[in-house]
């Protein structure tokens, strides 16, 4: 088989996405089937993606050819919390380009989604994977799988040199790298290596297609969009996080119990994360801000509620690599269970190659603005500054200045 990092088709199937898109999609089907949403793509570092417009459009059109095979549906059917009516819906589901607008605006690539949440929700991950791989095909056409493979083995060597055997036995790592992967073939290759040779515990992948293909566990619960949408779906803004968690609990009855804390801020989240939720959810996910300070805050919260932190799990997923994961693991070992979801550093780390820095985020729900503030100054995402100000006011979040970038 060719050692080229690229294949003809970028997105392999409807399952070539993050698992949490499917878990949220089922909850949307059952609770909000007619809600409209809007999303916008943003390249964070100003890279010129205009030359790739036509090819990106072509790849988006190819998405419409995808449907779930009986084998795909049989795989999902084995997951206990995937309901029969959702499986029937997925069997009929097709991507529809009427909900996608891809243009050049102000000399930048612009991708906007607008349509029913139920029909738009699956676009995010494949669209980002398409932009990344199209760009990489043009910029780095001669890249070989061996370059990515050798880089990963170098990381394994570093880990076995710096971690003890006991530490490695407890270090749990998962792949969260679909959306910014260098290419599909690189992610597939990396997962095979991780499954067979990772010196710690490799616990699975967020990619459902590759989980099925490589007999791995598909991982994921909810994303920021779930909590953001409830800013316009709940009865009052102040109750939006509670509404999001309540709806999740009704849908999954204690399963899929890792909650994301930083949609507004972790402090604002923990104010709503009372004894009921703290007992019911298995743990929390970190996605911005200082990871150890965040963990200390979570441990303290559990202790105040009379819950043993060792009965809970913290999942870390913010720009991780193996050295960072090992540092966090050591800081928290024996105090609370930890697991690490590593993305770009596994699926797009090739010597001499700069990975994409991009996002595709929900900007409106039910015709009104939604926002993510996060625990990191400068990571706020919203088109409407007035709504952000209102959100900060309601949740008593101070407006911190963004850190200045060096000249």
Swiss-Prot record:
Enzyme Commission number(s) of this protein: 6.3.4.21
Modification Phosphohistidine, positions: 224
Pathway the protein acts in: Cofactor biosynthesis; NAD(+) biosynthesis; nicotinate D-ribonucleotide from nicotinate: step 1/1
MF terms in GO: nicotinate phosphoribosyltransferase activity
Alphabetized UniProt keyword annotations: Ligase, Phosphoprotein, Pyridine nucleotide biosynthesis
Source organism, top-level taxon: Bacteria
GO biological process, one term: NAD biosynthetic process via the salvage pathway
Listed GO CC annotations: cytosol
InterPro entries (UniProt xref): N/Namide_PRibTrfase (IPR041525), NAPRTase_N (IPR040727), Nic_PRibTrfase (IPR006406), Nic_PRibTrfase-Fam (IPR007229), Nicotinate_pribotase-like_C (IPR036068)
Modification after translation: Transiently phosphorylated on a His residue during the reaction cycle. Phosphorylation strongly increases the affinity for substrates and increases the rate of nicotinate D-ribonucleotide production. Dephosphorylation regenerates the low-affinity form of the enzyme, leading to product release.
Gene3D superfamilies documented for this protein: nicotinate phosphoribosyltransferase
Name of one Pfam family that matches: NAPRTase_N
Catalytic activity: nicotinate + 5-phospho-alpha-D-ribose 1-diphosphate + ATP + H2O = nicotinate beta-D-ribonucleotide + ADP + phosphate + diphosphate
PANTHER family in alphabetical order: NICOTINATE PHOSPHORIBOSYLTRANSFERASE
Known role: Catalyzes the synthesis of beta-nicotinate D-ribonucleotide from nicotinate and 5-phospho-D-ribose 1-phosphate at the expense of ATP.
Family to which the UniProt record says this protein belongs: Belongs to the NAPRTase family.
Protein name: Nicotinate phosphoribosyltransferase
Taxonomic source organism: Pseudomonas syringae pv. syringae (strain B728a)
Organism placement in taxonomy: Bacteria, Pseudomonadati, Pseudomonadota, Gammaproteobacteria, Pseudomonadales
Gene designation per UniProt: pncB
